[in-house]
Amino acid sequence: MLALHGLTGHGKRWEPLATQHLSEIAVAAPDLIGHGRSSWAAPWTIDANVAALAELLDHQATSPVVVVAHSFGCAVAMQLAAARPDRVTALVLLDPAVGLDGAWMREIADAMLASPDYSSPEEARAAKANGSWADVDAAVLDAELDDHLIPLPAGRYGWRLSLPAMISYWSELARETVLPPNGTGTTVVRAARTSPSYVTDRLVTDLRERLGPDFRLTTLECDHMVAEAKPADVAALIRERMR
């Protein structure tokens, strides 16, 4: 299984799901470009990530894999499936953020530029706990800060990521959606508490028209961090695509 995190995330976020719920499955969860301990060098595009992941699969995977992805990672996953159908057998897409409104993406990018960091770890934790991580177990949130929050030179704190890369990626989310090829089993999970919803009606319609019976849409009662909030449910959906 290949697991792809969302924008501003990192691969280690998948560790609780992999070790506690999918321990019998081999999981690769790399940091995407500009995130975590991956290269921060440009280009910061979906295409560059697809090329890097295809190379990873060519060197490491002995057979086609199920790709599980979250948010921005879903855009990468779908384009990877389209570019390399020989390497991708199925997709599980958790609250996918793809083909979104450009004006909305500009608002989010502007907000990130205006407030990119925090005065303390406590402020960083509160920002997540009062936002899309509100329904995630406190221990998982603590691990996120331990793994991903770093001190900055000016005495503030920020996530282990390249800010220029993040701004570029918000634009990438407004690109036209690249759909997986016919025959790709695809499960989309809509997070019921994400408002406004990232999962657009157009995405659902386009996937249903392209994939027919190979497409499944399900809704989970959680906020945007689906794998962290509902790991058992996500693990069950992944196993369905591995049969």
How would you name each of these model-derived features?
Residues 26-68, 236:
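Active-site loop/oxyanion-hole signature of alpha/beta-hydrolase fold enzymes
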